[in-house]
């Protein structure tokens, strides 16, 4: 009757485990030979769990813009360049970064708006024509400004494209390597003062920039203020004409290689151009620039992977930093244990100090206690009649696995334990302890040493028998000269008298010839 509750608990636990395995088997997905591609896609998209990748793919499949479905053709570079020109035209009049407000523009285009209320529209279906080009209007700060595609002329767009072609003939230098970026002269004094006042605001607004502002570029330039251009060439606007807008940094167009002749023929920047102090050129940067000019043929833009769009939607992959390992000693007096993990330290305190030996044996005649439950379960097998461990050689059964291991050594002849004193070998620890105890008792019992060789014996009679057998010449030497002083043997340092307290018996042959040398 006492064992029925334990049987019921084990049956319920086994049933719960079976139900849990059944539920988990329904959630498993077999990828077959596509496991490597699946894991590679999960790492590229930045997911940490396989379920997150599956949910993302399901959402993409059910949405209208699924990448697996046949969608519209990719945008031509001219369309993206047109969007960049619109954004740059806005940056010439306003230092704030425009953001995507949503659809609602003309012909179903997208509307971009900055914090100051300036807007311009652009759509994937809209393509730049000679009659459409961005032209900012110089309005006071209190009014709302908007740039639309209808307020431009074809001649201005042609000038912008020609200026863009001239500027893209020179490669852009890497970040903080070449000469500092330069700006165009402001169209007026009032506009120049406005740009100087908004320098600090531009740095604060960089964190709020959209994807167009921070997209990858071939020169890997910093997303600084919109007015700063990476091209080292300066140009002065003509009278009565708006300064031309250069190509945007986020355009995925290929950039030609940097040539050494373009670096040598470059004119020094004018005095009126403002340069940021943190990007000032140093001698080390000049050396890097010359090295870059020699290997400029390799500085070409790489094609953008196809999965960049999905990566941009879910954000960059988070890189986890390795946690610092700290040494945490146990604060209980007399312990001295040191751990590198807080979890291990708490486990040690709980089971070694706080709940020390909290698992007691239920047998009234035993009374043993243990720190861990698994040790108690192993101990409970000694009180039961269950013998689950069977020897494969003789079919003998045992209660514990350790007893089976020791018994198996009888069949294999293995004796892994050895005495350090005499080299005695045995199969189990108990036999070695019993053997070493004999060594300790024997050393304590040998109280009578031999004065000639130092060997020890348990009884004085054993010492006398040893002297008569091993040292007979040394025993007969002192008997020849009873009247004179005894002369010691050269091989003995200081022999004691024959009639010592060890109970040695005198020699029975006093007439034996002496072996001492004559003087």
Curated annotation (Swiss-Prot):
Keyword Zinc belongs to the record: yes
Start-end of C2H2-type zinc fingers: 328-353, 359-383, 389-411, 417-439, 448-471
Pfam family of the protein (one): zf-C2H2
PTM per Swiss-Prot/TrEMBL: Phosphorylation at Ser-470 results in loss of DNA-binding activity.
Keywords, alphabetical: DNA-binding, Metal-binding, Nucleus, Phosphoprotein, Repeat, Transcription, Transcription regulation, Zinc, Zinc-finger
Chief localization: nucleus
Positions of modified residues (Phosphoserine): 162, 231, 470
Ranges of biased composition (kind: Basic and acidic residues): 164-173
Ranges of Low complexity composition bias in the record: 247-266
Protein's recorded name: Zinc finger protein 692
Source species: Homo sapiens (Human)
